[in-house]
Amino acid sequence: MGWSTAWCSVLALWLLWCAVCSNAASGDGNAFPFDIEGSAVVGRQDPSETSDSGVTLGRLPPAAERCDAGFFRTLSGECAPCDCNGNSHECLDGSGFCLHCQRNTTGEHCEKCLDGYIGDSIRGTPRFCQPCPCPLPHLANFAESCYRKNGAVRCICKENYVGPNCERCAPGYYGNPLLIGSTCKKCDCSGNSDPNLIFEDCDEITGQCRNCLRNTTGFKCERCAPGYYGDARTAKNCAVCNCGGGPCDSVTGECLEEGFEVPTGCDKCVWDLTDDLRLAALSIEESKSGLLSVSSGAAAHRHVTDMNSTIHLLRTRLSERENQYTLRKIQINNSENTLRSLLPDVEGLHEKGSQASRKGMLVEKESMDTIDQATHLVEQAHNMRDKIQEINSKMLYYGENQELGPEEIAEKLVLAQKMLEEIRSRQPFLTHRELVDEEADEAQELLSQAENWQRLHNDTRSLFPVVLEQLDDYNAKLSDLQESINQALDHVRDAEDMNRAITFKQRDHEKQHERVKEQMEVVGASLSMSADSLTIPQLTLEELDEIIKNASGIYAEIDGAKNELQGKLSNLSNLSHDLVQEATDHAYNLQQEADELSRNLHSSDMNGLVQKALDASNVYENIANYVSEANETAELALNITDRIYDAVSGIDTQIIYHKDESDNLLNQARELQAKADSSNDEAVADTSRRVGGALWRKGALRDRLNDAVKQLQAAERGDAHQRLGQSKLFIEEANKTTAAVQQVTTPMANNLSNWSQNLQTFDSSAYNTAVDSARDAVRNLTEVVPQLLDQLRTVEQKRPASNISASIQRIRELIAQTRSVASKIQVSMMFDGQSAVEVHPKVSVDDLKAFTSISLYMKPPPKPAEPTGAWVADQFVLYLGSKNAKKEYMGLAIKNDNLVYVYNLGMKDVEILLDSKPVSSWPAYFSIVKIERVGKHGKVFLTVPSLSSTAEEKFIKKGEFAGDDSLLDLTPEDTVFYVGGVPANFKLPASLNLPSYSGCLELATLNNDVISLYNFKHIYNMDPSKSVPCARDKLAFTQSRAASYFFDGSSYAVVRDITRRGKFGQVTRFDIEIRTPADNGLVLLMVNGSMFFSLEMRNGYLHVFYDFGFSNGPVHLEDTLKKAQINDAKYHEISIIYHNDKKMILVVDRRHVKSTDNEKKKIPFTDIYIGGAPQEVLQSRTLRAHLPLDINFRGCMKGFQFQKKDFNLLEQTETLGVGYGCPEDSLISRRAYFNGQSFIASIQKISFFDGFEGGFNFRTLQPNGLLFYYTSGSDVFSISLDNGTVVMDVKGIKVMSTDKQYHDGLPHFVVTSISDTRYELVVDKSRLRGKNPTKGKAEQTQTTEKKFYFGGSPISPQYANFTGCISNAYFTRLDRDVEVEDFQRYSEKVHTSLYECPIESSPLFLLHKKGKNSSKPKTNKQGEKSKDAPSWDPIGLKFLEQKAPRDSHCHLSSSPRAIEHAYQYGGTANSRQEFEHEQGDFGEKSQFAIRLKTRSSHGMIFYVSDQEENDFMTLFLAHGRLVFMFNVGHKKLKIRSQEKYNDGLWHDVIFIREKSSGRLVIDGLRVLEERLPPSGAAWKIKGPIYLGGVAPGRAVKNVQITSVYSFSGCLGNLQLNGASITSASQTFSVTPCFEGPMETGTYFSTEGGYVVLDESFNIGLKFEIAFEVRPRSSSGTLVHGHSVNGEYLNVHMRNGQVIVKVNNGVRDFSTSVTPKQNLCDGRWHRITVIRDSNVVQLDVDSEVNHVVGPLNPKPVDHREPVFVGGVPESLLTPRLAPSKPFTGCIRHFVIDSRPVSFSKAALVSGAVSINSCPTA
């Protein structure tokens, strides 16, 4: 029975264990991570699982009773069927959980598929789970798991696989998963792939590596490439073979013979050799370290001997230098001899080439003669053939007409045959045939020889450039060698001078040594005599003795503290390392102070002994302070240790508590076990199960507690012991340092006693001298500091070439940024009824005059249930207005529990009471309050949100000022803005004189600008750091704040290391949503050195500028078709996609806008700026040279993503000034700027002639312009400016202002009102009225929608359009309240900016003199420079917007975008500008400044000289380096930069000549200076200043030939002695410095210019001219040729038509072609002109026309000069009307099938750019 009971218990426990394990397993299986068919899986719960655990289990039947297969025993004892969805026939008794699920299923009821399988085991077909088809179900399944979504299978691929069905290998792996048996393996490129990639790049199918780096090759980049040798796998040191281009061993580098193949099987030898070499290198390093460790010091007493040996050594080296100099001189002589021998060879080669050319011409002539003879022979043969044919025809004729007998015929035939044989045998024919064959052979031979000579001649000519280049390099090397020799001579002379100086110094030292001995004797006598003179310092010495005694006491206390610390060390468990380190630092400082004192004590300077005594006193005080600080630090460390010990004790207490609970559980389990002993078998089994569970839980709890204890001990006490040990070491070190200090300071008493004996006779005059010196220094500083401040201001106003001005500017920027950040702190302040805040208004008072709006969040304290004194019904909220508070103000208050808005415009208050929602009924969270004033109309808004929904309660109340005033007339110095209360010395007006506000308050906006309480001027009775603000709930009106960011035009965000969230791949994507009304702004920016990427908004359209190191320069991607204008105050989704490292795509609102291809380059950036960037980044040289825009973004952004990964911009550490949310008020366009050709229009329901009132601000410098216009039939209502007078015209009745100076650039406010009795016009505060002639007549009110205009009108010919700004417009409407117009909502906007109005100021003379009657905008606005002002731009080169009118027929602008005051040189050898100058410009000192940008290595930049070029000054490029040179008498001073500056970036260069010294300053950082001895000769300059090049034949005398040719690049901002040089007297092949992409072609600029071809081209009686053009204007001269007798040819365009005019000496005749396709469409078009005597044909693309002129009986074929692109007017005949020069590009110019090179033209005059043509 006992055995049976035991077995039953074991069986019950086993069943319980199985149930627990099954439950745990099923629980784990429930964590299925995928959403199937878009719905979440909800687990089912069996009722038995939720049964009470305390139910008695006596109903469970004995274990021997089993249910059938497919059934399980429930707790009630019944058999129930298993619910396993047909996937199992076994389930667990009690719970019904299924066991042994089949068909790849799992779960409590086999209702789910295993990972890697998919199907519907419950309802699906088939009814079992199949392997995931990723990509193949059974044979190739590479998915972790899969699921269905939207009817499709989604695979979760393994690590090495990608694709919707895992059908591809991931990047960095290769293989073909679709091929059965194939898997994805990792790429193996031996570590020689691109290190910038996160994986090795190989073919995704074969695994062959792409782009092997480090000079490697092979399938896996496993060996060095041909021509290299080394270890490609391990050492990765493949180096170039040194075999003269021949092959070498790929491992050792040994040179091999041609065709030699490296045998296989030598790998072991190579690796053995590599190991031996490595061991040899290690032994060499050991030997080297041993040699370096050998000491080479010398004794001090042998210093003189060593000096003599050094002199001897220097003399030896001097002789070596002389020998080297002699050797160099011999080498130079040899080089010169070699050069002399080389020059005859070159001349011989040239002579041989000439002889070959002459022989070729002779052979050609003889060949032509032979051909003529052969032609003559052929003609003779033809004549003979004709005669034979004639004879034959005659024979036939006579044979037919005469009947001959057979005998006669036979005779004749025999005779004919004889004649034929005789003819054949005649000698002349044979001789001529042989001669012809021989001459033909000789001609062929001569022709081949001529070809060979021609080939040799061409080869010889091809060698000329190489030889010349070698000669040039050799010449440069000789120059460098000469300079090196000169430098060596200088060094030799310097060494000789140093030797002499050393000798003299040695003698001086010996003499000084003797004098020192004598002075020492004198000093000894003085010391003995000064003992009696020191009575005054005696008191000081006694005080020092006292200090020493105190220090001794302090050290005793330190010893006591040390013992106390050592006693407490045993209780320490943790100690702060930082505090101990600080104590050690203090001890170290003590050591330093002691050392300093010791040095002072050992000094023998008698005149400083008193001061040293004072220093010693200060040192003692410092020692005492440091010791006390060390004690405090130690005490602090002890306190921290005690706190940590208490914390550990608390943890021990918790552990003991848990242990007691465990014991209680154990006792309960034992009691249960005791009770279970008396129960039956079922109870025993149940009890055993419960006891086992309790024991298991107890054991688990104990294990957890033990683990916790161990972790605590390991983490805390172990670390504490370790730190304690460290602390002991530190304290011991501190004690040792303190002991050392004591040892050092102990001799002080002895030294002081010595002082007392030696300083008795010291004179006290040293004190008086020191005091007088200090007084004089203070007085001097007092005088100098104001002067320094003045100089600081002066330096700040000058050109920022120094770091001081930049620092000042940076400080100001930081202050502005700080204020900007403070204005965006969206946190409330708690006001207690006594506090107040004065806020910076941030908005100009001019902007507040006509329109004022303030919004804020308020949370007043709740009203108590019972009246108390704490709650106040009347409270002051805010005040904005004048300081005198009598008029011109507005405010907000609470009166009688209601919100009250008060404003005053000069006479009386207007109070608007919002009584529909008492303040006491507001909820206990923030509500929005907004007060607004438009003119005389006021309004207060209240928005009360709801916590439970997005619904809001809105309340509004309106009011109106009854007087005539409409402006809030404030001045900046008289304006204050108080919130919550006012200071005690400020008196509020009576309507606002209430108790201060109690509660929380937060400012939101002021006139649409974000504002904050934390941007305060002063705070009163408040500490913001202690006053806890109220938390603002995220209610309905703030939901949008969390997802969007606001940029105010000065803020920006920076995301560092964007690759931490995503990687650059085949497709790189940036996404962002923006919302803005601005025209311009910087959206995204990435910079890395000279490479950059910029996404900008210009005039409302997107532009992308980027350069990833492209060889062709930056790429510009723009919305040329104007598909997406984004400055409409709506959100637009922008995507930048970079595909396959070579294609940039711009997508807006998921629509493709533009794309462009570029050179294949990866994105080289890791950081990105959003919405703007710091000024130091925007003003960098890279961005200044390429980016036209540096305006930060203003508006809202959200959803910034990189590779579809979101970034929270406010969490970035360097984000500056970015605010939460997107305030709607900040996106309203209340202002519009008109340029004289623009207007805006809208259609609304407004009655302008009946009960109308409207107003607006305007600001302009133009005296005339249409401000507002409306028409209804013949009735017109308009407001305009006429000669500075405001005129209102209503149905022909005009009301005019009395003042005529409203075009002064200041803001003015206009209010118009029309009633049935009068018309009224108010300008500022001047009121004018006129009678309504329709008084008493009933007029029907217009209720239909009508169009009205601001700024101009397309239907008003009477008025010119307005130039200036209009803002804050409002109307009285029929359908809504008075409010400010949002111009963004207007339906028609033509060339109008709705974002900013440029601040314009009138010139001084305009304030006293009337302007002209002109509607065009003035050109002398602020920001433009006068003619006399310097044109140097201190910030950088600006982009020049050309003022030339654009041709309406042309797609391209006539003036491409260029840099202001910068010009492009090059293309021809003598491209240049010439400037005239005065003689006084070049005196003893002359200074030039210039900016340059080039990629050329040679070229002339600047040159000026006299007529004979004896006196000269020049700046040029040589081998990429800048060289500044001028003459000093017969010598030349040359300054050459060490670095190269032909990097394509802008550089500032200043070169100065001052008598015989020169200075070269580059970029304000590098200063090079040289000097020559003055010559005394006069320095005179007479010729012009050459810039960019010189005239032919100039500068060759002084500059090497390669640098004489023209500079190729851009030069700008030339200044002479601080004055700008702008007007060139002559220009040759110089154009503005264009920015943007360029292509091959010759560009003729709008400034005019032409090209004169060389003499090898002429237009005579017969020719063909062909060329391609891309015009930028529809008219202009293309080609012109003329002769002295009046004949000419002229090809030009006129309004898109191509015309050819010809005069052949008889009369003019012409033809023309009007192409169907516009020539000015921005594309290339081909034009061909063909002349054959009097016939002229013109081809334009595929269209042809011709003309036949009169014949000239005596034609003369003249050689006429050919002009291209223009012609001087003096050469045009009266019959040929002058035509303007051609503007555009010309290329592929051909005359008679011979291409023309404009770079070799006879003359290039004017603004013509050779071989460089802008494309946009």
Swiss-Prot record:
For the region Domain II and I, give the residue spans: 256-825
SUPFAM superfamilies documented for this protein: Concanavalin A-like lectins/glucanases, EGF/Laminin
> Which residue intervals are annotated with compositional bias (Basic residues) in the record?
1409-1419
Q: What tissues express this gene product? A: Strongly expressed in peripheral nerves, cardiac muscle, fat, dermis, lung stroma, aortic endothelium, endocardium and endothelium of blood vessels in skin and brain.
- Look up the coiled coil feature and give its residue ranges: 431-523, 556-604, 655-717, 770-799
In this chain the Laminin EGF-like domain maps to 82-131, 132-186, 187-240, 241-255
Please give the residues the UniProt entry marks as glycosylated.
39, 104, 215, 308, 333, 458, 550, 571, 574, 631, 639, 735, 751, 754, 780, 803, 1088, 1283, 1361
According to the UniProt entry, which residue ranges have a biased composition of type Basic and acidic residues? Answer: 1421-1430
Q: Cell attachment site: where is this motif?
A: 717-719
Q: Where is this region: Disordered?
A: 1409-1433
Signal peptide (UniProt feature, chain positions): 1-24
Q: Which InterPro entries match?
A: ConA-like_dom_sf (IPR013320), EGF-like_dom (IPR000742), Laminin_aI (IPR009254), Laminin_dom_II (IPR010307), Laminin_G (IPR001791), LE_dom (IPR002049), LMN_ATRN_NET-like_EGF (IPR056863), Neurexin-related_CASP (IPR050372)
Q: Which UniProt keywords apply?
A: Basement membrane, Cell adhesion, Coiled coil, Disulfide bond, Extracellular matrix, Glycoprotein, Laminin EGF-like domain, Proteoglycan, Repeat, Secreted, Signal
Example GO biological process term?
Answer: cell adhesion
- The Laminin G-like domain extends over 826-1030, 1042-1222, 1229-1397, 1462-1633, 1640-1813
Keyword Secreted on this protein?
yes
What pairs make up the disulfide bonds? 82-91, 84-98, 101-110, 113-129, 132-146, 134-155, 157-166, 169-184, 187-202, 189-209, 212-221, 224-238, 1000-1030, 1196-1222, 1365-1397, 1610-1633, 1785-1813
Q: Which PROSITE patterns match?
A: EGF_1, EGF_LAM_1, EGF_LAM_2, LAM_G_DOMAIN
Q: Which Pfam families match?
A: EGF_laminin (PF00053), EGF_LMN_ATRN (PF24973), Laminin_G_2 (PF02210), Laminin_I (PF06008), Laminin_II (PF06009)
Give a Gene Ontology cellular component term annotated to this protein: extracellular region
The Gene Ontology terms for molecular function here are:
signaling receptor binding
Q: Where in the cell is it found?
A: Secreted, Extracellular space, Extracellular matrix, Basement membrane; Secreted
Q: What is known of its domains?
A: The alpha-helical domains I and II are thought to interact with other laminin chains to form a coiled coil structure.
SUBUNIT field: Laminin is a complex glycoprotein, consisting of three different polypeptide chains (alpha, beta, gamma), which are bound to each other by disulfide bonds into a cross-shaped molecule comprising one long and three short arms with globules at each end. Alpha-4 is a subunit of laminin-8 (laminin-411), laminin-9 (laminin-421) and laminin-14 (laminin-423).
Describe the task this protein carries out.
Binding to cells via a high affinity receptor, laminin is thought to mediate the attachment, migration and organization of cells into tissues during embryonic development by interacting with other extracellular matrix components.
Stated name of the protein? Laminin subunit alpha-4
Look up and give the organism this protein is from. Answer: Mus musculus
Q: Which gene encodes it?
A: Lama4
